Amino acid sequence: MTESPFDPKFDELPQTLPIFPLSGVLLLPRGRLPLNIFEPRYLAMTRDALAGDRLIGMVQPKPGPDGHKAGDAGARDSGAAEIYPVGCAGRLTAFAETDDGRYLITLTGFCRFQVQEELPLNQGYRRVRVDWSGYAADREMAAPSGLRRDDFESTLAHYFRLYGIQADWATIKEAPDERLITSLAMICPFAPTEKQALLEAPTLADRARVIHTLIEMAVAERGSGDTARH
C-alpha cells in the first residue's frame, strides 16, 4: 500500500485524539478496519472526525479485576474502563450512512501512539493526549520482516485447518510480508492480550516473530486437544 496524498505529515499530527475502546479489535499501520457505528457518543465522534482531521484512535480496554474483558457480561463498560497505553490511529477513509441511523466507516491504520493522559469527555466520547514520537518508523513502507515464509505458511495451514478458517492461498502467497502479517494479526481470533502484544511489537520483524509464535502455540494447544479427544 502506498502513502495516500490525503495522509497528514508526521510532524503535523494532532496532540489529542478521540478514542474508540474495543476489546479484541486490532488496528495496525496500513491495515483496514471496517466499523459499524451506532451508539450516540460514537456517532458524534465520527461526525467530529469527519469535520476535522479524520483521525480516530483505536485502543483496547484492559481486562477488569474479575478477569472479564470490557464488553463481556459482568465486565466494565468499555467506555469507562482503563485502557492500554498504546493504540493505533486510523484515518477515516470510507464512510456511508444507513437508513436506520448508523454509520459504516473504514479506518486505515496510520500510526501508533502512546497515551499521555485522558481528557474530559466530549459529547460522551473519550479523548486522550498522545505522544507519537516513538513511532515515526510506522510510516516506513519497506521495513524488513525476517519472516521465513515456507515455515510460516506451513504452520499457518495447520492453524487454519484446526480453526476451520477458509483461506485464499494464492492471495496469501502473493501478499508482501507486511500485508500478510498485518491482515492475519487483525483477523485471527487471538486473545485481546495477544493482540496487544502484536500492536506493541516495536518493529515489523518483531511482530512477525510474535505472530509466528502465537500461531505455533495455538496449533500445539488445539492440536493436542484434538488428539486427546480421539
Go through the PLM ranges and name each one.
Residues 1-168, 193, 204-207, 213-230:
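Positively charged
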